[in-house]
Amino acid sequence: MPRSSSSSQYRIKNLTHSTVAVRDIAAGEELTVTYVDAMLPRAQRQARLRDWGFNCTCAHCAAGEAEGAESDARLRRIAELEKKLDDFDDRSVTAERGAELVALYEAERLDIYLGHVYTRAALNFALLGETERASEYAAFAVGAVEREFGPEAGDIRSMRMLAEDPQNHWTWGRRRYD
């Protein structure tokens, strides 16, 4: 079920607004943006939209109860994983937790956040000393962040360095539990 296909940025500095596609858009497909926090459970997203007099009929909001419950469960798991990844004292964090996080974001079609989540996964792989996966996810992060924010966006330089030479990145091996 597709969600937002594009992201909007507002730049106060020069009073500009831009909307960019965060994934490939098929010919004839509408550009979509989200008006509420996409990480909220479905009922909360719909309630917030109703507060604005809007009844969303996108495929994601119109899905059946079972699909909605599965989606909400994935969102809860995302929140759990992000909390674990943020806790450097949590020894249950494995290298694969970052990949699991990416898979959940992809399953939820949260394309507007993929730059962020690929970056997180790449850093987690590097922190745990996984060379190939750190490089792979850093390259994904570069592509997603660059697509959304441009070639000079934050984290691009660090992700390029991580993609090219994981073992010399500042995060390398800092979360190993030898």
Ranges and model annotations:
Residues 160-178:
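Alpha-helical linker/edge segments of TPR/alpha-solenoid repeat scaffolds
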Residues 147-151, 155-166:
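Long amphipathic alpha-helical scaffold regions
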Residues 138-141, 152:
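Membrane-proximal bilayer-interacting regions
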